[in-house]
C-alpha cells in the first residue's frame, strides 16, 4: 500500500515538474518577442482638439478618435467602482490574471452553453489594457498566453491606479467616444464628476458591446445590462440597497449639448483648422494634440450673418421665379413614394411635400410624416408674375419644397445662386463672423477666402484714393463725357460707358465716386497714372499682381471677399495696416499657451503672463504702419459715407447710423458686392453663381447684396450708437456747392480738404488730359450710347 502511495506521489511530482517545465518553457518562448510595455509609462493618448468662439461657445471638435484624457485622481470613485463591479471584481487582489475568475468562468460557461446563454469572459482590466495597447484582437492561444504574461509583468511595475487610468482613458464606448470623459460628454453632456450612479453604471456597461448597446435602438437590452452592473455594485458592497433601487428605477435619458453652449460656424471652423495646421506644420498634432483654440468669432454675429446671407440668397432666387417641381409621383401610396425620393441637398429647415389637390386659390399638400396642410396662393405669388390660379403652377403629384410659416406652409425652392459674408473689426483685424456659402454640408468651397471674382465698382474707391493721395482735391471738376483710350498698336480702342449710358457733364470727383461713374473713374485714373493705381491695389492687398490696364480701374481684376473686406477695413480704421485673423490663442492639452496673437490681454481666454514660461510658436508679427495717410483716408471715407447718404447705398441710410460703403457689379452682372463700414465694424458680402453667369439684366450690388448688409446691420448693430469717423488735424471741413465744387456759405455738402491745400481752394479748371496721347474725347454713336459697362 505504501509502495503504491509512494509511486503515486512520485508520478504526481514528476507531473508537477513536467508541468512547471512546460510552463517555464512557454513563458520563456513567448517572452522573447513581447512588445515593450514601458511605453505605457509615457502614455499621451490622442485627444480631441476643440475650437471655441471668443465668447466661449463650442464651435467644432476635430479628432481621429474623440477622446478627452482625465487623470485617475479626477475620476470619481463611483465611476471606478462601476467598472470594477462590471469587469473585474478581484482587480485589486490578483496579479494581472485572475486564476479564480478563469476557473469560475469555465464552470459558468459550461452551464451557459447547456442553456444557450451568452458566454462569459475572464479577461481582467489589466488584460484588456494589454490587448488595447500592446496586442491585437486576434483570437488565438498564442495571443492569450502573451496577454497573460504581459498582464503579470505590468502588474509588477505599474500601480493599480496607473492601470485603471490607462484603461478608463483608452476604452471605446461607442458614438465615437474614447475614454470615460468623452463618453460622459457624448451620452449625458456632463463631466465625469457630475455622473450619477445610474449614469456611471451605463457607461461601465458599454465596453462589452459599445456598438450594440444603443438605448435609442434597443432600450430594454441596454437597461438590463446597466441594471446588471448596478446589481453587481450592490453585491460587492459599493452602494446600498436603496441607492441600487433608485438607480435601477431611473430611466436612461441621453442629453446633447445645450444649444446655447454651441455655435454653428462650419466655414469659419474649417478656416481655423487650415490656419492652425499651417502654424503647427503638423496635421497629426492638430487632430491628436487635444488643443484648445480660442477664435475671434462672435457667436451672435455669426448666427445673424448666416441668417442674413441665406435670407438674401433666397429672396434673390425667388425674384427669378419658380423653376419646377422636384418630381411627380403617383398619389395611391404617396407617403411611401415621397420617402423613396432622395432628400435634396441644402434642404435645411425646409421640408418636402407632395401636392394632393389643387384649387384656384390654394394647394393641398401632404408631408413625409403623413400630416396634411395647405399653401395659399398668397404664398406662391413670387413663383410667377401675375399668378391668378394655382392650377397654372402646380398639379397633383408634384413634389415641392415648402417652409413652415405661422398659419401653414409657403412654397419655396433651394437657391441655385450662392454667396458669402464676412464681418471684421477694422481696428484689430478680428474676423467676428464668416459664412462662406449657403450650406457647408453641400459645398465646402469657402467663397470668403477662395472664390476669385471681379469686384466691379468696389475697386473704384482705390482709384479715387490714389488721386487724393497725390494732391487732387475732392472738389476737382472732371468731365463725365465719352472717351476713347488707345490700347496699343494693333489693338482696338477702348470706349468705356456708364452703367445707364448717360453722361453727367462736368461734376466733382466726389460726385463721380458717389454715383459710381465709369467715365469719371477712367479720367481720374489717367490723371493719376496706372503705375500709382497698381501700387495702391497692391498696398491694400486687393491683388498682388494686377495687370496694368485701364479696365482694371473699373474692376476687371480678380480678388476675394476676404481681401476686399480687409481693404475697406484699412479705410475704416484711418489708414493703418490690418490683417484679418481668425485665431486668438492656442493651448496644448495641459493648458499651456503655445500661441497668442499679440500681447493684448484676452479676458475671455483665462490667460495670464504666468502661463507664458514655455516655448511659444514664433509667429511673425506684422509691423503696424500706415497704408495711406490719414488725411487722404478721411477724404475717401467722406466720399463713401456720401455714397450711402445720396447714391447707390442709399437704402442703408434707414439704419440711422453713420456708414460708409460701396456697391460693386462686374461685367454682365455676374458678380455683385457690397462692403459697408463704421468706425467699429466692416461687413463685406458677395453674391454670384459658382459657375459664373449673368444674375439678371438689372442685377446690381444695390439690389442683390445691399439688402443682406442692411438685414445684418439692423439686427447686429441696432443697439450700437452711431459713431462719427474721427477727423484728423490735417483735415479742414468746408462747405461747398455739390454741383460746382465751389466754396459757398450755403454749400450743399461738407467737403474735407487737406490743411496744406487751404490756400489753393479757389476752384480750378478741370484737369487737362489732352497731353496724354492715349486718351481723347469722342462723339458716341447711338450704338455706343446703348452699351453698358458696370
UniProtKB/Swiss-Prot annotation:
It catalyses: [GlcNAc-(1->4)-Mur2Ac(oyl-L-Ala-gamma-D-Glu-L-Lys-D-Ala-D-Ala)](n)-di-trans,octa-cis-undecaprenyl diphosphate + beta-D-GlcNAc-(1->4)-Mur2Ac(oyl-L-Ala-gamma-D-Glu-L-Lys-D-Ala-D-Ala)-di-trans,octa-cis-undecaprenyl diphosphate = [GlcNAc-(1->4)-Mur2Ac(oyl-L-Ala-gamma-D-Glu-L-Lys-D-Ala-D-Ala)](n+1)-di-trans,octa-cis-undecaprenyl diphosphate + di-trans,octa-cis-undecaprenyl diphosphate + H(+); Preferential cleavage: (Ac)2-L-Lys-D-Ala-|-D-Ala. Also transpeptidation of peptidyl-alanyl moieties that are N-acyl substituents of D-alanine. Residues 49-220 are annotated as: Transglycosylase. The chain crosses the membrane at residues 7-27. One of its GO terms (molecular function) is peptidoglycan glycosyltransferase activity. It is found in: Cell inner membrane. Residues 28-790 are periplasmic. Residues 398-711 are annotated as: Transpeptidase. Keywords: Antibiotic resistance, Carboxypeptidase, Cell inner membrane, Cell membrane, Cell shape, Cell wall biogenesis/degradation, Glycosyltransferase, Hydrolase, Membrane, Multifunctional enzyme, Peptidoglycan synthesis, Protease, Signal-anchor, Transferase, Transmembrane, Transmembrane helix. Its EC number is 2.4.99.28, 3.4.16.4. The active site is at 87 (proton donor), 457 (acyl-ester intermediate). Gene3D superfamilies: Biosynthetic peptidoglycan transglycosylase-like, DD-peptidase/beta-lactamase superfamily. It is a single-pass type II membrane protein. It comes from the Bacteria. Residues 1-6 are cytoplasmic. Pathway: Cell wall biogenesis; peptidoglycan biosynthesis. One of its GO terms (biological process) is peptidoglycan biosynthetic process. In the N-terminal section; belongs to the glycosyltransferase 51 family. In the C-terminal section; belongs to the transpeptidase family. This is Penicillin-binding protein 1A. The gene is mrcA.
Amino acid at each position: 500500500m505504501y509502495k503504491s502511495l509512494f509511486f503515486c506521489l512520485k508520478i504526481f511530482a514528476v507531473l508537477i515538474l513536467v508541468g512547471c517545465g512546460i510552463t517555464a518553457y512557454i513563458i520563456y518562448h513567448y517572452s522573447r518577442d513581447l512588445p515593450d510595455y514601458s511605453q505605457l509609462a509615457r502614455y499621451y493618448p490622442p485627444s480631441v482638439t476643440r475650437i471655441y468662439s471668443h465668447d466661449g461657445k463650442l464651435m467644432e471638435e476635430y479628432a481621429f478618435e474623440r477622446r478627452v484624457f482625465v487623470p485617475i485622481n479626477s475620476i470619481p470613485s463611483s465611476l471606478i467602482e462601476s467598472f470594477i463591479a462590471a469587469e473585474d471584481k478581484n482587480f485589486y487582489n490578483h496579479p494581472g490574471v485572475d486564476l479564480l475568475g478563469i476557473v469560475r468562468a469555465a464552470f459558468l460557461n459550461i452551464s451557459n452553453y447547456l442553456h444557450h446563454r451568452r458566454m462569459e469572459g475572464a479577461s481582467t482590466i489589466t488584460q484588456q489594457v494589454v490587448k488595447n495597447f500592446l496586442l491585437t484582437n486576434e483570437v488565438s492561444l498564442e495571443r492569450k498566453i502573451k496577454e497573460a504574461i504581459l498582464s503579470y509583468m505590468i502588474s509588477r511595475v505599474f500601480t493599480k491606479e496607473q492601470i485603471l487610468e490607462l484603461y478608463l482613458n483608452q476604452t471605446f464606448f461607442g458614438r465615437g467616444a474614447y475614454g470615460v470623459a468623452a463618453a460622459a460628454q457624448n451620452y449625458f453632456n456632463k463631466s465625469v464628476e457630475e455622473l450619477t450612479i445610474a449614469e456611471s453604471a451605463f457607461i461601465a456597461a458599454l465596453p462589452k458591446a459599445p456598438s450594440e448597446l444603443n438605448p435609442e435602438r434597443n432600450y430594454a437590452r441596454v437597461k438590463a445590462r446597466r441594471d446588471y452592473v448596478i446589481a453587481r455594485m450592490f453585491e460587492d458592497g459599493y452602494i446600498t440597497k436603496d441607492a441600487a433601487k433608485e438607480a435601477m428605477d431611473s430611466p436612461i435619458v441621453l442629453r446633447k449639448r445645450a444649444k446655447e453652449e454651441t455655435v454653428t460656424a462650419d466655414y469659419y471652423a474649417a478656416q481655423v483648422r487650415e490656419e492652425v495646421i499651417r502654424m503647427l506644420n503638423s496635421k497629426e498634432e492638430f487632430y491628436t494634440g487635444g488643443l484648445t483654440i480660442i477664435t475671434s468669432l462672435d457667436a451672435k454675429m455669426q448666427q445673424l450673418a448666416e441668417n442674413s446671407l441665406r435670407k438674401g440668397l433666397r429672396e434673390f432666387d425667388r425674384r427669378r421665379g419658380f423653376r419646377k417641381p422636384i418630381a411627380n409621383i403617383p398619389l395611391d401610396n404617396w407617403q411611401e413614394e415621397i420617402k423613396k425620393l432622395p432628400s435634396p441637398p441644402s434642404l435645411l429647415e425646409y421640408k418636402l411635400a407632395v401636392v394632393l389637390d389643387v384649387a384656384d386659390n390654394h394647394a393641398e399638400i401632404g408631408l413625409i410624416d403623413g400630416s396634411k396642410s395647405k399653401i395659399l396662393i398668397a404664398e406662391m405669388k413670387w413663383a410667377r408674375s401675375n399668378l391668378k390660379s394655382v392650377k397654372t403652377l402646380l398639379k397633383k403629384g408634384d413634389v415641392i419644397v415648402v417652409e413652415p410659416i405661422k398659419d401653414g406652409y409657403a412654397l419655396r425652392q433651394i437657391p441655385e445662386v450662392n454667396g458669402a459674408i464676412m464681418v471684421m473689426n477694422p481696428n484689430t483685424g478680428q474676423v467676428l463672423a464668416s459664412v462662406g456659402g449657403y450650406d457647408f454640408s453641400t459645398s465646402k468651397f469657402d467663397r470668403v477666402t477662395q472664390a476669385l471674382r471681379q469686384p466691379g465698382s468696389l475697386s473704384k474707391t482705390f482709384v479715387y484714393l490714389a488721386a487724393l493721395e497725390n494732391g487732387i482735391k475732392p472738389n476737382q471738376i472732371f468731365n463725365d463725357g465719352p472717351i476713347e483710350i488707345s490700347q496699343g498698336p494693333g489693338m482696338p480702342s477702348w470706349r468705356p460707358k456708364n452703367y445707364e449710358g448717360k453722361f453727367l457733364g462736368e461734376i466733382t470727383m466726389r460726385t463721380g465716386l458717389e454715383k459710381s461713374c465709369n467715365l469719371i473713374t477712367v479720367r481720374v485714373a489717367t490723371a493719376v497714372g496706372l503705375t500709382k493705381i497698381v501700387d495702391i491695389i497692391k498696398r491694400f492687398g486687393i491683388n498682388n499682381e494686377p495687370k496694368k490696364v485701364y479696365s482694371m480701374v473699373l474692376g476687371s481684376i480678380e480678388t476675394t471677399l476676404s481681401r476686399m473686406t480687409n481693404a475697406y477695413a484699412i479705410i475704416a480704421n484711418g489708414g493703418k495696416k490690418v490683417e484679418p485673423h481668425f485665431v486668438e490663442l492656442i493651448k496644448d492639452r495641459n493648458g499651456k499657451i503655445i500661441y497668442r496673437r499679440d500681447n493684448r490681454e484676452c479676458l475671455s481666454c483665462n490667460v495670464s503672463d504666468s502661463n507664458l514660461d514655455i516655448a511659444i510658436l514664433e509667429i511673425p508679427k506684422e509691423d503696424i504702419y500706415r497704408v495711406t495717410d490719414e488725411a487722404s483716408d478721411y477724404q475717401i471715407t467722406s466720399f463713401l459715407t456720401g455714397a450711402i447718404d445720396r447714391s447707390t447705398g442709399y437704402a442703408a441710410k434707414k439704419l440711422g447710423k453713420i456708414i460708409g460703403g460701396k456697391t460693386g457689379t462686374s461685367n454682365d452682372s455676374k458678380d455683385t458686392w457690397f462692403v459697408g463700414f463704421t468706425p467699429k465694424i466692416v461687413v463685406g458680402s458677395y453674391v454670384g453663381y459658382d459657375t459664373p453667369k449673368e444674375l439678371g439684366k438689372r442685377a446690381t450690388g444695390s439690389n442683390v447684396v445691399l439688402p443682406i448688409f442692411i438685414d445684418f446691420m439692423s439686427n447686429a448693430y441696432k443697439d450700437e450708437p452711431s459713431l462719427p469717423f474721427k477727423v484728423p488735424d490735417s483735415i479742414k471741413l468746408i462747405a461747398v456747392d455739390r454741383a460746382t465744387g465751389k466754396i459757398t456759405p450755403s454749400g450743399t455738402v461738407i467737403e474735407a480738404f487737406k490743411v496744406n491745400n487751404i490756400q489753393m481752394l479757389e476752384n480750378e479748371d478741370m484737369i487737362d488730359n489732352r497731353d496724354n496721347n492715349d486718351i481723347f474725347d469722342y462723339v458716341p454713336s447711338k450704338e455706343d450710347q446703348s452699351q453698358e459697362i458696370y
